[in-house]
Design a protein with these regions (language model features):
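Substrate-binding pocket helix/loop in short-chain dehydrogenase/reductase
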Residues: 75-79, 83-88, 179
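Conserved Rossmann-fold SDR core element
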Residues: 25, 61, 143-146, 153-168, ...
Length: 233
């Protein structure tokens, strides 16, 4: 097993990609603390640091952190349609909480001399506007946070990377008509398509010399100039 000596905190495990990654880590021998909104509402002030501290207490030490949490969203929203509450919730969960948990666990790993690994689940939306301004901004921010953490923690032997899935139907995203025609492999992804790559990145066997990188797992959708339908809301 690739991760039999590891302990991991994974957010966003109520379903989808977060759940798939948590299950895959467990299959590879890791002891995993799963965190979903019912366990820690990361939209609330102070919740992120409390979750990190709880994970350290529960697991004894944390060697892996995966941030897959993201609040529900409408499928498309223009920049003029997003409400302040939606904007704040998206950035708080995706960006602020991800950074604060990683910061707390990075300090923990450094203090305990743990050669830890962190993984942010970002998105192709981080690189181009798709009528989801709050989501895209949060994912672009995650990418830069990942790179800053990779620079800061690399000398400590701690690796920080990101994985950017393509079209994965789930909460807030059902897939636009004709979307499959714009995917080279001819189908949308499932969480099970993403989890094995996450395991590889987090493992020392396959990812030992990798940090500060974003791995795209999109079935080839980025080969097309795919555009979500504009939907005024």
């Amino acid at each position: 097993m690739l991760l039999r000596s590891d302990t991991a905190l994974v957010t966003g495990t109520g379903g989808g990609i977060g759940l798939a990654i948590a299950s895959a880590l467990e299959e590879e021998g890791a002891k995993v603390l799963r965190a979903d909104v019912k366990d820690a509402d990361l939209s609330q002030p102070g919740a992120a640091v409390k979750l990190a501290e709880s994970a350290i207490r529960s697991l004894g030490q944390v060697s892996i952190f995966v941030h897959a949490a993201s609040p529900p969203r409408r499928e498309t929203q223009t920049a003029l349609a997003v409400t302040e509450a939606e904007w704040r919730a998206m950035l708080e969960v995706n960006l602020n909480s991800g950074f604060l948990i990683a910061q707390a666990l990075g300090r923990h790993m450094r203090e305990k001399k743990i050669r830890g690994r962190m993984l942010f689940v970002t998105s192709l939306h981080a690189d181009s506007p798709r009528n989801l301004p709050h989501y895209s901004a949060s994912k672009a921010g995650q990418t830069m946070v990942m790179k800053e953490l990779a620079r800061a923690l690399g000398p400590e032997g701690i690796r920080v990377n990101a994985i950017a899935p393509g079209a994965v139907p789930g909460a807030g995203f059902k897939g636009a008509p004709g979307l499959v025609d714009k995917i080279a492999l001819g189908r949308v992804a499932t969480p099970a398509d993403i989890a094995p790559m996450a395991v590889a990145i987090l493992s020392e066997k396959y990812g030992a010399y990798m940090t500060g990188a974003t791995v795209v797992v999109d079935g080839g959708i980025a080969l097309y100039n795919w555009i979500d339908p504009l939907e005024e809301a």
